[in-house]
Amino acid sequence: MNTFTSNSSDLTSTTKQTLSFSNMYLLTTLQAFVAITLVMLLKKVLVNDTNKKKLSLPPGPTGWPIIGMVPTMLKSRPVFRWLHSIMKQLNTEIACVRLGSTHVITVTCPKIAREVLKQQDALFASRPMTYAQNVLSNGYKTCVITPFGEQFKKMRKVVMTELVCPARHRWLHQKRAEENDHLTAWVYNMVNNSDSVDFRFVTRHYCGNAIKKLMFGTRTFSQNTAPNGGPTAEDIEHMEAMFEALGFTFSFCISDYLPILTGLDLNGHEKIMRDSSAIMDKYHDPIIDARIKMWREGKKTQIEDFLDIFISIKDEEGNPLLTADEIKPTIKELVMAAPDNPSNAVEWAMAEMVNKPEILRKAMEEIDRVVGKERLVQESDIPKLNYVKAILREAFRLHPVAAFNLPHVALSDATVAGYHIPKGSQVLLSRYGLGRNPKVWADPLSFKPERHLNECSEVTLTENDLRFISFSTGKRGCAAPALGTALTTMLLARLLQGFTWKLPENETRVELMESSHDMFLAKPLVMVGELRLPEHLYPTVK
């Protein structure tokens, strides 16, 4: 028994020693594991910090604390020329200028532009929140200028699936055809009366008439019509307000970068935007309100235009998907988006061709070859009018409607072209710089439509490689490039087919100079026309 007790005691002692050793081993293992994990985490943090330190902002001026380069911006108007001069001085294709706390990133390189709008499109899918955009969008209820979020996604889906899909484009063909004929009739009346033709006035109002017809079913806001088919006083007021608002949209207003100054209106931008928006509302809202009432009361049941589509869309429960507060600013936004780009391209194209008669001759020869002189050019002819479209591509390239594309805001920190782009940065793709980049375009300042011709394929007005910008691309790109192509091409083709153009007496050349404050031709193009088709082909004003 003593032997058993002794053996038992030895066994207990051995077991305790084994457990003690196991516990020590487990503790040591856990300590080692924790230590290794901490080392790995520390290494990761250090590596990330090192990488962040390696990535710098794009080159640019240092600026003042807090306010950045705002003081210089205020005395450097127009701001777009100042920003391009900075890039030229630094010899860079991407730059960073801090305005307040906002990093403004400017880009003139197609490769970098593709990195932003193609490779990292989703990351740069937002818009800035500014005073002007808040006014125009009724508190960010629209599609084009509303920051990224649920409201943007809702409105973008409506526009893309209900308004500008291929089926809707075909459905509204007749309305566009009516405005093409109205353009020809209006210009015919001016030419027949020996009146000079202001191309800026005509091209803008053609585009305005077309979008009003598509949106509201009418080309005019007046009860009366002008005798020669031109716009009424109401239509002129609306167009002027629209271009006023366009000129102050994303226009480097001081309060956009120093929000504490909002309401002081130090440079007058806020009042201009309020007044312009109110004028457009004055013409749009009564039509919208009356149409909503007609649908609500059952007096209208057939969809005839974009406004009807907006009103008639239902949600999953059968209720109206959109409120009046969403419909009104979205219509205003879409109406504003239509006239400036096509009209500017056609005015510049005509000005360039007057100074280069050989290009004008080739364009008219193509129209005569494709269409002939026994009928008017139609949208169905557009695929074959490659030289005409090459002229328009060259106008978009060399003479963009604006110096910069609408801003793309970074939703998080990003890396572009090897540079650190902080969250909230505004990336501005330079329409001006992309189209005139000498690394991309040979002899970039010369107007040469032939550079866009490709014998193997049809010429299109879109530019997917972002070597220039006609209609912007990506999640925030142009929603209706097909409509833009139709309006721009038909506008130029009808003006060329129906009339022979020359400068007024005692003028031999057009001075191809940009305005001091924007990218439009400094002086509106005015010419004198002669009929070049059989008289019976010209439509009458209806």
From Swiss-Prot:
Q: What is its EC number?
A: 1.14.-.-
| CDD domains in the cross-refs | CYP79
Any one biological process term the GO annotation gives: secondary metabolite biosynthetic process
- Any idea where this protein resides? Membrane
Where exactly are the transmembrane stretches of this chain?
Answer: 21-41
Question: What does UniProt give as the signal peptide span?
Answer: none
GO CC annotations? Answer: membrane
Cofactor(s) required, per the database record: heme
Q: Does the keyword Calcium apply?
A: no
What one GO molecular function would you report for this record? oxidoreductase activity, acting on paired donors, with incorporation or reduction of molecular oxygen
Q: Which InterPro entries does this UniProt record tie to the protein? A: Cyt_P450, Cyt_P450_CS, Cyt_P450_E_grp-I, Cyt_P450_sf
Checking SUPFAM superfamilies in the record gives: Cytochrome P450 (SSF48264)
Annotated membrane topology: Single-pass membrane protein
The source's domain of life comes to Eukaryota
Report the coiled-coil segments.
none
Listed A to Z, the keywords are:
Heme, Iron, Membrane, Metal-binding, Monooxygenase, Oxidoreductase, Transmembrane, Transmembrane helix
Positions with a binding annotation for heme: C478
Q: Which family does it belong to?
A: Belongs to the cytochrome P450 family.
Q: What does this protein do?
A: Converts tyrosine to para-hydrophenylacetaldoxime in para-hydroxybenzylglucosinolate biosynthesis.
- Recorded protein name is Cytochrome P450 79B1
